Regions:
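Pre-recognition alpha-helix immediately N-terminal to the DNA-recognition helix
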Residues: 22-26
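Glycine-centered, phosphate/nucleic-acid-interacting loop/turn motifs that mediate DNA/RNA or nucleotide
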Residues: 60-61
Length: 184
């Protein structure tokens, strides 16, 4: 599968505002699954999952990776996510759609700050811990993720390989530090 899919089309982003659809993509990046297995993993009814899968397939966010005929001659279709990591280009989206992805950006910024202070023993980022500063960091990190993610769009990765995400975040943080968007 592709390492990164940059979501910059508001119609695609509109499909991904639903947290259940993002959960489906998360499971399908770990390994291919049938709809029955997905429904079981997510605790959804078959019709409910089918509704979400139709939306995801219509925008090519989920792909068929194989079909198998099992011993009872029933065709099993296995699906996978189109990419391992979906990066949201918030600047290319209308605010009414971008706002759904804001909590993810904010949580990323908080995680980066927290991990940085735990591992370095002090604040590695020279910012005030105010809502305004944390929001600015979240916006900066989102922009940098799009920029770094573009280098990974054509890279193929294996299911469940978290190394690529760690590498992307590392490059993003290093880029932020080197551009003085955050201080050491």
């Amino acid at each position: 599968m592709k390492a990164v899919y940059i979501v910059n089309d508001p119609k695609v982003a509109g499909i991904l505002v639903d947290p259940m659809r993002r959960a489906i993509l998360d499971l399908l990046r770990q390994r291919p699954m049938t709809q029955a297995r997905l429904a079981n993993e997510l605790g959804l009814s078959a019709p409910s999952l089918s509704f979400h899968m139709k939306r995801l397939r219509a925008k090519r966010l989920v792909i068929v990776v194989k079909r198998e005929i099992e011993k009872h001659r029933i065709m099993q279709t296995f699906f996978a996510s189109a990419a391992y990591l979906f990066v949201y280009d918030l600047e290319s989206m209308p605010k009414n759609i971008a706002r759904y992805f804001y909590p993810v950006s904010l949580e990323r910024a908080r995680s980066i700050l927290s991990a940085s202070s735990v591992f370095s023993g002090s604040e590695r980022f020279n910012i005030d811990y105010t809502c305004v500063e944390i929001n600015k960091l979240a916006e900066d990190v989102s922009r940098l993720l799009v920029k770094v993610g573009k280098h990974y769009q054509n890279k193929e990765v294996e299911y469940g390989d978290e190394k690529v995400i760690i590498d992307i975040y590392k490059r993003c943080i290093n880029s932020a530090i080197s551009k003085k968007q955050v201080a050491i």
